[in-house]
Amino acid sequence: MGSINKINSKRRDTPAPEPPPTELSREPVRPSILVVDDEENFLKLLHWFLTQRGYDVATAASADDALSLLNGRAFSVALLDVKLGTGDGIHLLDQLTQRSPDLKVIMMTAYPTAGSIKQAFDKGAVRYLTKPVDLPELAEAIKLLS
């Protein structure tokens, strides 16, 4: 005895409803990195190094410039110098993580102390690198975070 297969031959006179529109995400399309350091040559080096790896990079030479860049823009990762010429990187870290809780922050300094390292992690930093920064190590850290 054979099996009988039924075929539904109902015609669809109306197209299937479209799914409701979704909100545009504030997340960046490609990982976006904010670099804050008061050393101009170091900023240029990091900008070049990170853009070569496909990141969208914004740089700031001061805490005020960094906070201005955060308005209306989402960053995946921030690289902050602990000692800024016109401000404190740890204080900036606190401000950035309050305004953007999902931001992953890597602190950098040429003068690490146990106190500054502890303070940075207490304020939300996820990594702490000593200058001169090893660029392959930095690239790997960012890749893991973004």
State each model region's role:
Residues 59-77:
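Acidic, metal-coordinating helix/loop segments flanking the phosphotransfer/catalytic sites
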Residues 91, 112-127:
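Alpha4 helix (beta4-alpha4-beta5 surface) of REC/receiver domains from two-component response regulators
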Residues 44-52:
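Charged docking surfaces used in two-component/phosphorelay signaling
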Residues 43, 85, 113:
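The feature encodes the CheY-like receiver
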Residues 62, 88-91:
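Acidic catalytic/metal-coordinating carboxylates
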Residues 1-32, 136-146:
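Non-catalytic signal-transmission and effector/linker regions of two-component phosphorelay proteins
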Residues 68, 90-102:
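Short amphipathic alpha-helix used as the core "switch/output" element in two-component signaling
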